[in-house]
Regions:
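Short, basic and Ser/Thr-rich N-terminal targeting/leader segments
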Residues: 7, 17-20, 68, 75-77, ...
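Short, glycine/acidic-enriched loop or turn micro-motifs at the edges of active sites
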Residues: 18, 30, 102, 188, ...
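Short alpha-helix plus adjacent loop in nuclease-associated cores
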Residues: 99-112
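Short beta-strand-loop/turn "lid" adjacent to the catalytic site in phosphate-handling enzymes
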Residues: 65-98, 122-131, 151, 160-196, ...
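N-terminal glycine/serine-rich phosphate-binding loop of ATP-dependent small-molecule kinases
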Residues: 1-93, 104, 120, 148, ...
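Short clusters of small/polar residues that mark proteolytic maturation junctions
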Residues: 37-38, 95, 293, 318
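Asp/Glu-rich intrinsically disordered low-complexity tracts
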Residues: 222, 228-232, 493, 499, ...
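Active-site core segments that coordinate phosphate-bearing ligands/cofactors
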Residues: 12-13, 110-122, 136-182, 196-209, ...
């Protein structure tokens, strides 16, 4: 089909996630994905960004190249810290969102500035995943590296910079180390903890509080960067923040480059989500997010007040325990994922009183980092593989429903849910979701929605008009009455401590006071589940987490 089009009439979208780089080539008129390619990323929480650049080149080649591409935009994993010296050289391997060595740094920032102040100014409360906390860690633990920092960028910022023809002095990049050409967008910048989604500007005081240095925004393509004459004490350069369809410039080959976006914001674009839509993404971990024009203010830190990629807001809640819960069920039951789904469907709603509290890796919402998973309400009568499988699916979805409630407490309304991610293909997940959620659930076809969202942004940048692309649905699930949530709450919320929030001084979530015996009768047993119960995840082929410090994969 691409051969029937004139040269350079297509658009490309890139999803540079934690584990891989994916490229889609799209017809801008219809949104049809014509070609695609991918390449793996190195495993780890510290990665040389040059590996991402190599993977991008490989993925572009696998997608058939960009000879017929008129515009491209890059979305990517959020929060990662890339530091550049005055010659554009990466100072140290990037610290990814999943590098949590900066936990103490995040807590120190909250203690110094206050959770309420952070929310009022940045819309979020720092956690270890956020860029500002990583900068504080770098300042305190690697002062020599910190002293060399001339610019700070996020993963998608740096890749866009390279795509524009920039690079370190030691490379063959035609534009050289032009730090003034660094760009970002509001959705990605809002995950740093030194950018305000409210004002759309950097908060340089918060940057100084984190890193102990002054900063300024990149001046843009008309400025001249001279690495040899830049004083050592010059302010740190932060990428210029572009509007939702503002051009970053052109590649050396003449391809228009869009502003890019954070992964969840790009997914919302790819899905065509709007006010009243709430996206529930079930990958390795989970995210719940919804585009809105409302101001978001949650001092507990559970709901991150991020910016969206279309000029609005994207309140987001992350849970650590999503599709990996299904992996654990498969290991525990010594069954395949297909068999676990069949077992779960053979049980009744509520698993005959058996409840899983699914905190296998602690939890982020509520903030219980040291919690473990538990099977509650176990009796001789309900101790069957079918009930265990059902309890695991219900526990996973109830955790996401808690995230949904946290988002809705910000004043949002919900008309429909969009269920995406690898686990959305699981028939038991789809069926049990009807017992957990109280509004209709649309299940879109499996697709690379992050990359498609980036392609949609590229088309928007190219034409000046946001395209309307059809998203095909494979199912619409209608809710049915049940007491599953009530049963779950009776056990899960007995775990919620008074400080179960990101902010140390925030109280118990409003719905945490359910009576501990609600919905369950009789003498029961509790089983605590610990240890490594993970396996290769058939349901979590999404590989990056959501922006609140638990990036969930959102592509299909």
């Amino acid at each position: 089909m691409a051969a029937d089009l004139e040269p350079r009439e297509l658009v490309a979208g890139v999803d540079s996630s934690t584990q891989s780089c994916k490229v889609v080539i799209v017809d801008p008129a219809t949104g049809e994905v014509l070609r695609s390619g991918s390449a793996p990323h190195p495993v780890g929480t510290e990665v040389d960004p040059e590996a991402w650049w190599s993977a991008l080149q490989e993925a572009i080649s696998a997608a058939g190249g960009f000879a017929d591409v008129a515009a491209v935009s890059i979305s990517g994993q959020q929060h990662g810290l890339i530091t550049l010296d005055s010659h554009g050289q990466v100072i140290r391997d990037a610290l990814l969102w999943n590098d949590l060595r900066s936990d103490a740094a995040a807590r120190a920032l909250i203690a110094e500035i206050g959770a309420d102040e952070f929310v009022d100014r940045a819309g979020i409360v720092p956690v270890a995943s956020f860029t500002g906390a990583k900068l504080r860690w770098l300042r305190d633990h690697e002062p020599d590296n910190a002293s060399r920092v001339a610019a700070v960028a996020l993963p998608h910022d740096w890749l866009t910079w390279r795509l524009l023809g920039c690079g370190p002095s030691s490379s063959s990049a035609p534009r050289g180390p032009d730090l003034e050409a660094l760009v970002t967008d509001a959705s990605d910048a809002s995950g740093t903890a030194y950018f305000s989604a409210i004002t759309g500007r950097y908060d340089f005081e918060l940057f100084h509080a984190a890193f102990g240095a002054t900063a300024r925004e990149a001046a843009g393509p008309d400025a001249h960067w001279d690495p040899d004459s830049t004083p050592h004490t010059a302010p740190v350069v932060l990428p210029r923040v572009l509007g939702p369809h503002e051009s970053a410039g052109h590649t050396p080959e003449g391809i228009l480059v869009g502003p890019g976006a954070g992964d969840n914001a790009a997914a919302a674009l790819g899905l065509g989500a709007g006010p009243g839509d709430v996206v529930i993404s079930i990958g390795t971990s989970g995210t719940v997010f919804s585009p809105t024009r409302l101001e978001i203010n949650d001092p507990s830190g559970m709901v991150a007040g991020f910016a969206s990629a279309d000029g609005g807001r994207l309140p987001l809640v992350a849970t650590l325990n999503a599709a990996r819960v299904l992996d654990s069920a498969a290991v525990l039951l010594r069954a395949s994922h297909t068999d676990v789904a069949a077992l779960a469907l053979a049980s009744a709603p509520g698993a005959n009183g058996l409840t899983l509290v699914p905190y296998f890796e602690g939890e982020r919402t509520p903030n219980l980092p040291d919690a473990t998973a538990r099977l509650e309400g176990m009796t001789v009568a309900n101790s069957s593989p079918e009930n265990v499988a059902r309890a695991f699916v219900e526990g996973m979805l109830c955790g996401l429903a808690d995230g949904l409630e946290a988002v809705l407490r910000q004043g949002l309304s919900v008309e429909r849910l969009l269920l995406i991610g690898g686990a959305a293909r699981n028939p038991a997940v789809r069926e049990v979701a009807r017992d957990i959620f109280t509004v209709p659930i649309d299940v879109p076809e499996q697709a690379e929605y992050v990359a498609i969202g980036a392609a949609r942004q590229a088309a928007w940048t190219l034409t000046g008009t946001s395209p309307r692309w059809q998203v095909e649905l494979v199912a619409t699930l209608h809710p049915r009455p049940s007491r599953v949530r009530e049963q779950y709450r009776s056990y899960a919320h007995t775990s919620v401590a008074p400080d179960a929030s990101v902010a140390p001084d925030a109280g118990v979530p409003p719905d945490a006071g359910v009576a501990p015996d609600a919905g369950v009768n009789g003498d029961t047993a509790t089983t605590t589940i610990t240890g490594d119960t993970t396996r290769a995840d058939e349901n979590s082929d999404n590989d990056h987490r959501g922006s609140s410090g638990a990036h969930t994969p959102v592509e299909g």
